[in-house]
């Protein structure tokens, strides 16, 4: 990915733990590496096709002078989020804030905090088989749209499916969607749980009826196995109510562990011969 860099931008601002730091202010030095596609601007010589580093420099300065944080960690985190939300062409950013006048009582050149943040692509399966199923799903998708760190990019049609497992229950309404998000996998899972709780989801019977079920199927190309989270979602290759919506919105997306596309996984599940 291409990069545009801003190095050693000096800003006088009021951040720090000690009262004199926020009252008197001091110098901060900011560097940013912005990951984007520069080819469109390179071919057209059109500034609107790129990220204007002059405007970004002023954005950084204004942000750090209008806001006050005790910690560099908080300043750099909030600044990175603001830039990613404000600049449509910015895909990822490495941001460094230095504090050369840090009051530590010892000779040093500088202290600094550097982070890398960016947009991630996630696929989420959704389902409901209690009450007004469509309303539960509609509300959940709108709930995702209302979160500033999430952009809902594509939503499948709702699919009526038979329940999975041995518990006798009503038919499901299922689907899948693709989002861009600034959230980590764990943070995204927490947000999904909040939406489930808002729909009065009760986790009583495994594979039992539920007002709303939201599962992370994929997060970039990552493979995650923790107590709380398994990505790609466990056993999704054996669930047509997951694969059919995924084939609708991302037929050529490849499962990072199985190395088969969504289309190939569905054909395999249905007993069809895969093309070599």
Regions found by a protein language model. Name each.
Residues 1-124, 128:
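N-terminal, polar/charged subdomain of small-to-medium soluble alpha/beta proteins
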Residues 14, 128-134, 219-222:
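Short acidic, Gly/Ser-rich segments with clustered Asp/Glu that frequently serve as metal-coordination loops
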Residues 34-36, 128, 178-181, 220-221:
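Short beta-strand-to-loop capping motifs
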Residues 37-42, 119-121, 164-171, 189, ...:
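Flexible, gly/pro- and Lys/Arg-enriched active-site loops
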Residues 42-54, 146-184:
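Short, surface-exposed acidic-centric catalytic microdomains
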Residues 79-84, 144-145, 192:
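Hydrophobic C-terminal alpha-helix "anchor/cap" residues
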Residues 96-100, 158-160, 217-219:
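Short loop/turn motifs enriched for small/polar and acidic residues
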Residues 119-150, 156-160:
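N-terminal beta1-alpha1 ligand-phosphate binding loop
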């Amino acid at each position: 990915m291409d990069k545009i860099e801003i190095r050693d931008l000096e800003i006088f601002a009021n951040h720090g733990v000690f009262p004199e730091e926020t009252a008197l202010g001091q110098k901060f030095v900011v560097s940013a590496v912005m990951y984007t596609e520069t080819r469109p601007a390179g071919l057209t010589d059109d500034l609107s096709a790129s990220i204007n580093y002059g405007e970004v420099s002023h954005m950084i300065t204004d942000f750090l002078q209008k806001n006050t944080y005790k910690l560099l960690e908080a300043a750099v985190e909030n600044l990175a989020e603001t830039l990613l939300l404000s600049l449509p062409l910015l895909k990822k950013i490495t941001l460094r804030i230095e504090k050369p006048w840090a009051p530590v009582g010892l000779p040093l050149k500088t202290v600094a905090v550097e982070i890398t943040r960016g947009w991630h692509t996630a696929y989420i399966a959704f389902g409901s088989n209690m009450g007004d199923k469509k309303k539960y799903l509609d509300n959940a998708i709108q709930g995702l749209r209302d979160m500033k760190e999430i952009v809902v990019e594509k939503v499948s049609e709702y699919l009526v499916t038979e329940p999975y497992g041995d518990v006798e229950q009503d038919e499901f309404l299922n689907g899948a969607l693709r989002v861009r998000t600034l959230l980590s996998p764990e943070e995204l899972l927490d947000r999904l749980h909040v939406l489930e709780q808002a729909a009065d989801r009760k986790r009583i019977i495994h594979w039992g009826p539920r007002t709303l079920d939201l599962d992370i199927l994929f997060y970039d190309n990552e493979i995650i196995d923790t107590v709380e989270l398994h990505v790609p979602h466990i056993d999704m290759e054996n669930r047509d109510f997951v694969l059919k919506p995924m084939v609708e919105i991302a037929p050529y997306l490849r499962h990072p562990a199985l190395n088969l596309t969504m289309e190939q996984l569905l054909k395999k599940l249905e007993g069809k011969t895969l093309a070599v």
